């Protein structure tokens, strides 16, 4: 019994299919590529461009008809699937209708991603949120729901706002710690209320420290120009007008409070001023001698203005100031020798005793 596939609309055959059409023999054999025979004798093509055909022993030995599986099949035949879509094959259901599957999926069924708009807070909402953030940075679910009901937002929006606010707060705190200067940690007022141990820069006195010589510096500055012009720097330091002749306390002294340190500085300043005047009075007389005798008994009470006014007066006859610096250098050298004759140790001891007495008074 000869069984053939139903006639379908003819399609253009490929080169491979044309070559296969001449390869039939008369021995009831089927020459095809990628073909499978079912139990009922029908053929299934594996590719849309393959040629499928059935053969059976014809009584006249004629070549069986060749049919190409194109866009589909009808009746009992199952043909190659879809011509252009590239999807599944066309399956016949035996009623003359074919059911096919589309190769391309439908993307319209997928739900589109919902776009969330940026939440805009009103000033009243921000004030309420900031007030609650000041209370706690980590509100629980109940507190967030309560806040959401008050401000008219959802709980998720309130939670996101607190997360962003915490991140901003942490970033600001980190930036503040990085750029904070050491001076910002000190108190605003200058002096401490009670004496406290200070740094070495306040307690140690050095020979080149000019903080204890404000009046002497002013005296040197307000000297007459003709006196400072011809006076060498080392001779000025021998007279006591420079910082090199400061009656410095040894650095090995114990640390004291800031108030005691200032008192010692004032004592040293007063003693340095008195000593400098004593040195100048040894080579002068007249107004300089009277001014020295007036200020010599007391250690305090000396002002820079009075000293500068006294020193700015014309020089006495016994200390002539001429264009040549020889006479002035000799007189200053003699004063320096007399300065060396005084006991620096005794002056230091007197300063310490005076500072101790002042400390006892203020205690």
From Swiss-Prot:
One of its GO terms (molecular function) is DNA binding. It comes from the Eukaryota. One of its GO terms (biological process) is neuron differentiation. Residues 69-97 have a biased composition (Gly residues). Residues 114-173 bind DNA. Signal peptide: none annotated. Involved in larval skeletal patterning. This is Homeobox protein orthopedia.
